[in-house]
Amino acid sequence: MNISELGEFGLIHRLTDNIELKNESTKYGVGDDCAVLEYPNKQVLVTTDMLMEGVHFDLTYIDMRHLGYKSAMVNISDIFAMNGTPRQMVVSIALSKRFKVEDLDEFYVGLKAACDKWNIDIVGGDTTSSYTGLAISITCIGEGDKDKIVYRNGAKETDLVCVTGDLGAAYMGLQLLEREKAVYYGQLSDLDKKIKDAKASGNDELVKNLQKKVNELNDFQPDFAGKEYLLQRQLAPEARGDIKEKLEAAGIQPTAMMDISDGLSSELLHICEQSNCGCRIFEKQIPIDYQTAVMAEEMNMNVTTCAMNGGEDYELLFTVPIGDHDKIKDIDGVKLIGHITKPELGKQLVARDGNEFEIKAQGWNPLKK
């Protein structure tokens, strides 16, 4: 169904009529000029992410349902990175005429799945037209106790540096998808050239056979057996609210924290800069999944570089006082990778052979040409 057939109000009703509000802080959601929220005795956290087609995602290999899920999770992750609890979400979408109502239905299936996982209310947004493809802007609103919110600037000398999960898998998933995309378009271009030549020579039978091959190519699905984890990390990342809950249960308050969206190197430098400190990170301690290592070897890439600079992991990077060592070391899903130092000692990566290298930001830069 064309979106124009529904109109703005019909589309709003279709996407939001089945939304149920779950949070006491949501006093009024979709349906008026503004949502109404109430946060007595709490600090309010607000984060926004914009995702642009061709810059942040490629619809060649991510479907609308996964895109909706991922778009929500990258925002939810920011709230958890401040040690907060996500409560509400505002969703704005600009889309071109090539998109149908059913595409938005699928987007919202994924979006709602992410929100339902963490009991988040969708309370508003906007939908408009676009001449340049799909643009998504999502704002997530959360809450936290004043003395529990964690910033980037609290790391202190001797603090332990920790990360959750494993790193580099999302980047390797992206490399895998990009490789298959290049193969697909290469084969398609070759067939298109052959069809053009066949038409020029008047060989209708060859044109028919080549067109059949094009149709078969369009229906072809790459074999990703053994690489499912990499695809899941790229297409459907998970915000680490589970780690926030584990830290609270263990009585651990991080001194600094952020999520790993642009790469471990970049995020370490952010924390060190804002906390006025240095760090020593040990290569052998960086958690890397087996599939990530295998894929890096297959593509002749340095797996540590992928883990340090790949980005889109949406794991948590945080520091804790050294006195919490015994509490943190046994928490499942958390790995100690180094410690905080004096600023004059710099930001160093200690390689497996003992050599030290300066950590540089080589991760994702959305404004890089």
What are the functions of these language-model segments?
Residues 1-369:
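Helix-biased detector of long, well-ordered alpha-helical tracts
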